[in-house]
């Protein structure tokens, strides 16, 4: 089957915004006008096509990026293929935004005309900068009370440090909003309310807006000629670019991320969506316009590039795993190069495993169509993959490559969870493992001491929704506990312990003597074991038992029962009995030997120190630093990034719970932070006493 649409006619883009700026409604309108949706779904009544998880429809927030393929006939009458990814705007779901930005070529940033640039707009904008994603801006909700297009333009400059190239001016605002002025064609588009936005009239610019339109067209031309020497020279000589040249310059500047074309409208009232779709064709990149994807050769580890070309070897990135109620597990993948046929065998180079593509689906929100073949630039859903997880590379087994992996933040909050009924234990385990496979920012583990199941995620809403999904999709009711910190223990000085284990009261006896030196491991946090036995005082075959015995005690330290780090043990002497000694006897002896020694070797409690990066507007720097200091934080430095300030600090995890709420209120929601594990550090003695008292009773 040959490729139906040329790769230069593809547009892979996402819609990103603050929560409630109208992303889902805008996507709905796009699907409606491109003919994929027969009825417009409203978020207000929980019927939106993209929001296909039950919870999203209830909460009216988009949680999962749904990938949709649709088609649009541009101004030139030629049909283009759109692959659209809808992304969430809530801070707990930034992982979804990150992973969709990684596989997109361009994006539409949505603003609420009333609120302008909101905190989460800043967050997703910075994420898009990280991946250098070309963006256009759509100033939505122009019909809303308080809508102010010109203030939004100003906020893009002051809050995002970005240049918006105004392509349209609004005609009227709030309830009077009825159309836009096209600054390239210099005409006005007035929508007919009764046609659901499908029809509009092209008329002359209203008399009272002509001067403003001229002023903004001049600004538009000045900005775009600035990126091209020849155009700039001609402009200085009084020769203005024609409309096609202006479009070509806007396209170039957008793809090079020099500036961002800005449009306006109201998706809810069906005004301004079609010109936005024409702009996607005119200004956002095709897969051919973006740099080749970088990777490393699986065998030689040399740097290589894969270009958006069907003739190149197959390479694709799995960016999302989803459980589909009808098909089972689906892996969403972006094909960067080559082509893929149904039934093909591909290699997962991250896991070093072969996978077979059982079914290949083209997704439209929550309906699907089976396809036989897919090409470079496509975003497809694959069924039948067993080993693949988010961020893995799938490729041609004969030309293996590892594409740059996605980075996922470490979970920052963990809670204990247990099923309400014993019978649900197994179902809960299965449900949690399924959910963890879908979402790399969600982790599940079992606490060795208490046997409790611990779940960890990006925030309280994130974990709420996991528990909620478990109840809805897997019918498991669960009880959750309070957040916990993973402490560790270590020793701080050298200690030599001599221990004899004997049991010789009738029957087969047990005998083993060990003399071991315990000390901090200078090489790091791992456990290191050495034997310096000479002369056979402990026979060779018993030495693994000595190591095993010590290792079995490392999981529970002497202070509060936390796992131990950074211990080195050297077996220097011992004794055995010809009949009564065994591997087990030496295991028991070394276990008891370490238990005794740990109490005498300066045991110390360690806590996880987190590397915290706060990005905040300058106004809040003093408050943020003061607050981090009050949390026993150590400020490592600060620097300017655009118009924001980045503060780096190391802070104990124990003092970071509820931090997101504090930071939001301290900065009116404008600051954001990331937190990753850095190292373990000794707990101050006054805090250690409290922790020991709290946990010793539990262990």
Swiss-Prot record:
<dbReference type="InterPro" id="IPR009022">
    <property type="entry name" value="EFG_III"/>
</dbReference>
<comment type="function">
    <text>Catalyzes the GTP-dependent ribosomal translocation step during translation elongation. During this step, the ribosome changes from the pre-translocational (PRE) to the post-translocational (POST) state as the newly formed A-site-bound peptidyl-tRNA and P-site-bound deacylated tRNA move to the P and E sites, respectively. Catalyzes the coordinated movement of the two tRNA molecules, the mRNA and conformational changes in the ribosome.</text>
</comment>
<keyword id="KW-0547">Nucleotide-binding</keyword>
<dbReference type="InterPro" id="IPR020568">
    <property type="entry name" value="Ribosomal_Su5_D2-typ_SF"/>
</dbReference>
<dbReference type="InterPro" id="IPR047872">
    <property type="entry name" value="EFG_IV"/>
</dbReference>
<keyword id="KW-0963">Cytoplasm</keyword>
<dbReference type="InterPro" id="IPR005517">
    <property type="entry name" value="Transl_elong_EFG/EF2_IV"/>
</dbReference>
<dbReference type="InterPro" id="IPR035647">
    <property type="entry name" value="EFG_III/V"/>
</dbReference>
<dbReference type="GO" id="GO:0003746">
    <property type="term" value="F:translation elongation factor activity"/>
</dbReference>
<comment type="similarity">
    <text>Belongs to the TRAFAC class translation factor GTPase superfamily. Classic translation factor GTPase family. EF-G/EF-2 subfamily.</text>
</comment>
<feature type="binding site">
    <location>
        <begin position="17"/>
        <end position="24"/>
    </location>
    <ligand>
        <name>GTP</name>
    </ligand>
</feature>
<dbReference type="InterPro" id="IPR031157">
    <property type="entry name" value="G_TR_CS"/>
</dbReference>
<dbReference type="InterPro" id="IPR000795">
    <property type="entry name" value="T_Tr_GTP-bd_dom"/>
</dbReference>
<dbReference type="GO" id="GO:0005525">
    <property type="term" value="F:GTP binding"/>
</dbReference>
<dbReference type="GO" id="GO:0003924">
    <property type="term" value="F:GTPase activity"/>
</dbReference>
<dbReference type="InterPro" id="IPR041095">
    <property type="entry name" value="EFG_II"/>
</dbReference>
<feature type="domain" description="tr-type G">
    <location>
        <begin position="8"/>
        <end position="288"/>
    </location>
</feature>
<dbReference type="InterPro" id="IPR014721">
    <property type="entry name" value="Ribsml_uS5_D2-typ_fold_subgr"/>
</dbReference>
<dbReference type="Pfam" id="PF03764">
    <property type="entry name" value="EFG_IV"/>
</dbReference>
<dbReference type="GO" id="GO:0032790">
    <property type="term" value="P:ribosome disassembly"/>
</dbReference>
<dbReference type="InterPro" id="IPR027417">
    <property type="entry name" value="P-loop_NTPase"/>
</dbReference>
<keyword id="KW-0251">Elongation factor</keyword>
<dbReference type="InterPro" id="IPR005225">
    <property type="entry name" value="Small_GTP-bd"/>
</dbReference>
<keyword id="KW-0648">Protein biosynthesis</keyword>
<dbReference type="InterPro" id="IPR053905">
    <property type="entry name" value="EF-G-like_DII"/>
</dbReference>
<feature type="binding site">
    <location>
        <begin position="140"/>
        <end position="143"/>
    </location>
    <ligand>
        <name>GTP</name>
    </ligand>
</feature>
<dbReference type="Pfam" id="PF22042">
    <property type="entry name" value="EF-G_D2"/>
</dbReference>
<dbReference type="Pfam" id="PF00679">
    <property type="entry name" value="EFG_C"/>
</dbReference>
<keyword id="KW-0342">GTP-binding</keyword>
<dbReference type="InterPro" id="IPR004540">
    <property type="entry name" value="Transl_elong_EFG/EF2"/>
</dbReference>
<dbReference type="Pfam" id="PF14492">
    <property type="entry name" value="EFG_III"/>
</dbReference>
<dbReference type="Pfam" id="PF00009">
    <property type="entry name" value="GTP_EFTU"/>
</dbReference>
<dbReference type="InterPro" id="IPR035649">
    <property type="entry name" value="EFG_V"/>
</dbReference>
<dbReference type="InterPro" id="IPR009000">
    <property type="entry name" value="Transl_B-barrel_sf"/>
</dbReference>
<feature type="binding site">
    <location>
        <begin position="86"/>
        <end position="90"/>
    </location>
    <ligand>
        <name>GTP</name>
    </ligand>
</feature>
<dbReference type="InterPro" id="IPR000640">
    <property type="entry name" value="EFG_V-like"/>
</dbReference>
<protein>
    <recommendedName>
        <fullName>Elongation factor G</fullName>
    </recommendedName>
</protein>
<dbReference type="GO" id="GO:0005737">
    <property type="term" value="C:cytoplasm"/>
</dbReference>
């Amino acid at each position: 089957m040959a490729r139906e649409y040329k790769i230069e006619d593809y547009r892979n883009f996402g819609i990103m915004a603050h929560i409630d700026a109208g992303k889902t409604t805008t996507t709905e309108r796009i699907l409606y006008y491109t003919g994929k949706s027969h009825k417009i779904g409203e978020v207000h009544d929980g019927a939106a096509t993209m929001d296909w998880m039950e919870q999203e429809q209830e909460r009216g927030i988009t949680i999962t990026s749904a990938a949709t393929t649709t088609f649009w006939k541009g101004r030139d009458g030629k049909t283009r293929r759109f692959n659209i990814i809808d992304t969430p705007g809530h801070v707990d779901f930034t992982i979804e935004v990150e992973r969709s930005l990684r596989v997109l070529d361009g994006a539409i940033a949505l603003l609420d005309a009333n609120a302008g640039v909101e905190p989460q707009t800043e967050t997703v904008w910075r994420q898009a900068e990280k991946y250098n994603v070309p963006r256009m801006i759509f100033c939505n909700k122009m019909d809303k009370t308080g809508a102010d297009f010109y203030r939004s333009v100003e906020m893009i400059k002051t809050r995002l440090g970005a240049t918006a190239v105004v392509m349209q001016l609004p005609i009227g605002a709030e309830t009077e909003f009825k159309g836009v002025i096209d600054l390239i064609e210099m005409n006005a588009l007035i929508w007919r309310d009764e046609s659901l936005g499908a029809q509009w009239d092209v008329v002359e610019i209203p008399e009272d807006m002509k001067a403003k339109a001229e002023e903004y067209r001049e600004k538009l031309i000045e900005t775009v000629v600035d990126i091209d020497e020849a155009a700039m020279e001609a402009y200085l000589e009084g020769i203005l670019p024609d409309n096609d040249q202006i479009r070509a310059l806007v396209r170039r500047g957008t793809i090079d991320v020099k500036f961002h074309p800005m449009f306006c409208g109201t998706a809810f009232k069906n005004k301004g969506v079609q010109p936005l779709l024409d702009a996607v064709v005119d200004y956002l990149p095709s897969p051919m316009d973006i740099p080749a994807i970088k990777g490393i050769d699986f065998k030689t580890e040399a740097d290589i590039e894969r270009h958006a070309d069907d003739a190149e070897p197959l390479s694709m990135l799995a960016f999302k795993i989803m459980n589909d109620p009808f098909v089972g597990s689906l892996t969403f993948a972006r094909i960067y190069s080559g082509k893929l046929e149904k039934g093909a065998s591909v290699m997962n180079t991250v896991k070093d495993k072969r996978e077979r593509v059982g079914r290949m689906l083209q997704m439209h929100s929550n309906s699907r169509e089976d396809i036989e073949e897919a090409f470079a630039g496509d975003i497809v859903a694959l069924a039948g993959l067993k080993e693949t997880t988010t961020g893995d590379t799938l490729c041609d087994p004969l030309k293996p490559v590892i594409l740059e992996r996605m980075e996922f933040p470490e979970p920052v909050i963990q809670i204990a969870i247990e099923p309400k009924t014993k019978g649900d234990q197994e179902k809960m385990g299965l449900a949690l493992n399924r959910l963890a496979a879908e979402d790399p920012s969600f982790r599940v583990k079992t606490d060795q001491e208490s046997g409790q199941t611990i779940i960890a995620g990006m925030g309280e809403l994130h974990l709420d929704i996991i528990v909620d999904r478990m109840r809805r999709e897997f019918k498991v009711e669960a009880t959750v506990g309070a957040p916990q910190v993973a402490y560790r223990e270590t020793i701080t000085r050298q200690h030599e312990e001599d221990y004899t284990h004997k049991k010789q009261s009738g029957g087969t006896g047990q005998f083993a003597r060990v003399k071991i030196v315990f000390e901090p491991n200078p090489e790091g946090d791992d456990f290191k074991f050495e034997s310096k036995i000479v002369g056979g005082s402990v026979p060779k075959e018993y030495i693994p038992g000595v190591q095993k015995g010590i290792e079995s005690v490392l999981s529970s330290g002497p202070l509060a029962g936390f796992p131990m780090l950074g211990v080195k043990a050297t077996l220097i002497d011992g004794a055995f009995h010809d009949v009564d000694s065994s591997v087990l006897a030496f295991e028991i002896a070394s276990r008891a030997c370490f238990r005794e020694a740990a109490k005498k070797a300066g045991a110390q409690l360690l806590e996880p120190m987190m590397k915290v990066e706060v990005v905040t507007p300058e106004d809040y720097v003093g408050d943020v630093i003061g607050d981090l200091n009050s949390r026993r934080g150590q400020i490592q430095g600060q620097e300017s990034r655009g118009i924001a300030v980045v503060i780096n600090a190391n802070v104990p995890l124990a003092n970071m719970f509820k931090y997101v709420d504090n930071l939001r209120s301290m900065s009116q929601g404008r600051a954001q932070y990331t937190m990753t594990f850095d190292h373990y550090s000794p707990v101050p003695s006054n805090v250690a006493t409290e922790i020991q008292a709290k946990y010793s009773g539990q262990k």
